[in-house]
Amino acid sequence: MNGMWALLRLASPQLPIGGYSYSQGLELAIERGLVCDPPTARRWLEDQLLLNLARFEAPLLLAQCRAAADGDWTALEALAERHRASRETRELHLESRQMGFSLRQLLEDLPELDEPSRAVFARLVEPGLAPAWALAARAWGIAPEDALAAWLWSWLENQLAVLMKSLPLGQQAAQRLTSALLPALGQAQRTACAHAPDDWGTVAFGLTLASMAHERQYSRLFRS
C-alpha cells in the first residue's frame, strides 16, 4: 500500500472505530463552564496535549508501534497491559476497549494483517486502542513515528468535533483553533519521541475528575 494513502487511512475520521462517540471529559468541562469559548478550548486542548498526551499516552503508543514494527511481541504485550492498567476511570477503560475491539474486527477482516499479528490479538486479554493502532500501523507499513502523528491528529480532530457539537463552535472557528494548536501538536510529538520509558508519567487530575463526573452527567451526547 502507498505509504501516504495508508497514513491518511489510519488518521481518517472514517476509520470505523467509534471515536466520534467519546469526548474524554471535554463534554463535562463544557457543561461546567470550564470550556466556554475558543480561548478556553485552546487552553484545555493545549494542556491535554502537552501535559498529558505528550508525557505518557503518546510515548506509550509510540513504544507499542515500534514493538509491533520490530515483531517484538513480548514487549508489545507488556506495553499493552501497561496501557490497560493506566485507564483511571470506567469510561476511559471502556473507551479504549471498545475502540480497540472495533479496530481489531476491522483488521482481522483484511488480508494485510499477518499471522503473527493475528496471534497477538488472540493472546491479548483485552486489546485496547493503542496496541490495535500499533498492529494497524504494522499491517499498513506505516512507520512508528508517522503512526504517532496520525494518532495525535485523530485525537485533535475528535476533540474539535466535540466542540463543534457541544460548545457549539462553528466550522471556521474550529479551523482557526486548529491553526492555533498545530505548534502544540508538533511539540507533543517531539516530546513523546524524546521521552525515555523511565520518564513516562503524568498526573492529569483534571481529566480524571472530569471523566468520573461525566459518568453521572444528567444530559450528554458522548460516552466519555
From Swiss-Prot:
Assembly and binders: UreD, UreF and UreG form a complex that acts as a GTP-hydrolysis-dependent molecular chaperone, activating the urease apoprotein by helping to assemble the nickel containing metallocenter of UreC. The UreE protein probably delivers the nickel.
HAMAP family given in the database record: UreF (MF_01385)
Function noted in UniProt: Required for maturation of urease via the functional incorporation of the urease nickel metallocenter.
Protein family membership: Belongs to the UreF family.
Gene name, Swiss-Prot/TrEMBL: ureF
GO MF, any single term: nickel cation binding
The keyword Cytoplasm belongs to this UniProt entry's keyword annotation: yes
UniProt-annotated location(s): Cytoplasm
A Pfam family recorded for this sequence: UreF
Protein name as it appears in the record: Urease accessory protein UreF
InterPro entries: UreF, UreF_sf
Domain of life: Bacteria
Principal subcellular localisation of the protein: cytoplasm
Cellular component, GO annotation: cytoplasm
Entry keyword set: Chaperone, Cytoplasm, Nickel insertion
